[in-house]
Amino acid sequence: TELAGENRVFSTILRGAGAYAHYIPSIVKYIPAKEEFLTAYTPYQAELSQGILQSIFEYQTMICELTGMDVSNASVYDGAPAAAAAAAMCRDRKRRVTLISGAAHPDVINTVRTYCYGTGDELRVIPAKDGKTDPDALRALLAAGDVSGVCIQQPNFFGQLEDAEALGEIIHAAGALYILSCNPIALGILKTPKECGADIAVGEGQPLGMPLGWGGPYLGFMAATSKHMRKLPGRIVGQTVDSHGERCFVLSLQAREQHIRREKASSNICSNEALCALTAGVYLSAMGPEGLAEAARQSMAKAHYLARGLAAIEGVTLRYSGEFFHEFVTDLPKQDEILAALEQADILGGLPLEGGILWCATEKVPREALDRTIAIVKEVLSK
């Protein structure tokens, strides 16, 4: 209790950078807490695990609908390992170089770099220009013909919306595979990764019903075209019929997994992610397509409202002029003073960057809090 009392709970959160304070329907925390689901058991024995297997199958189905892909796995630990595992899926004997956008989340870049080091592959970072992936730099890096896969984040770390379709065309023209790391809430209104030409779709699933809490537990979603199905890591639940002709669920393509291939398996994901996948499935079911789109629209509208208000203050400028979803960067002085003043007002301000602040707004932020934030920034800068 004493340690918990040291936690600071803000009434308004204007910080994102990979972890987002979205509305979570009340039902989301109750269903995963049922004793039928709350278990560390891995559902290897299908005849004893139909409920858990069905919940994972439904999660996979919803991820495929969200991304437009053909097949999804039962998730991995979080978004950064998902991107790294996707890079491993792209590897072949002749192409041992992976590219990742310099506008991707720094933690994702570092995680992919760690995985590449372990496999002896090389990671090269595509320079960013005006807050987005530089297409000319991408072409130059692809010219050598040694790139196996390219990872682009949409929206990127700075909140900017990449021209995902055009980048995909450049990548495929060079014979490389296209990994699109995307925000699942943004997919409520943006084109799907499949429509953008991606071969593999990954992302951080935390916005899908998982609360903020010291970085976890989260989940990383992964989906791919059927051509790459056998390279997906972790468990895949499939639907079939039993000896009586009744529908049932089983673990499919198990020869890929660690309990059979051991050290040759593509991952060692075990039971922990089933509960997070169930949480995401319940969230998506509760919100529905319309609810998810509404959350995305409100988040985008409130972020743009905040951006306009801040940009109208003398001394504050938007760092990038491109379109953004629900995050943006402002250049401004007195960062520490601004964030301290916001904290005094029970508002967690944006993430401090060099010379600026990365702001985020979700559907949970009331307009009054946005107006108050704008007023506080204006007051601090007027002194």
Spans of features found by a protein language model:
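Conserved PLP-enzyme active-site core in the AAT-like
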Residues: 5, 81-246, 315, 332, ...
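N-terminal entrance/gating region of PLP-dependent enzymes' catalytic architecture
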Residues: 1-58
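Short loop-beta-helix segment that forms the pyridoxal 5′-phosphate
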Residues: 44-48, 64-84
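Gly-rich Lys/Arg/Thr-decorated short loops/hinges at beta-loop-alpha junctions or inter-strand turns
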Residues: 35-46, 64-68, 94-95, 116-124, ...
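Conserved C-terminal alpha-helix-loop-beta "cap" of PLP-dependent enzymes
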Residues: 290-373
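Active-site C-terminal subdomain of aminotransferase-like
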Residues: 208-314, 318-321
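Short acidic-aromatic active-site loops that bind/stabilize oxyanions
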Residues: 46-56, 76, 153, 157, ...
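Flexible, glycine/charged-enriched surface loops at secondary-structure junctions
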Residues: 10-13, 71-74, 123-126, 291-296, ...
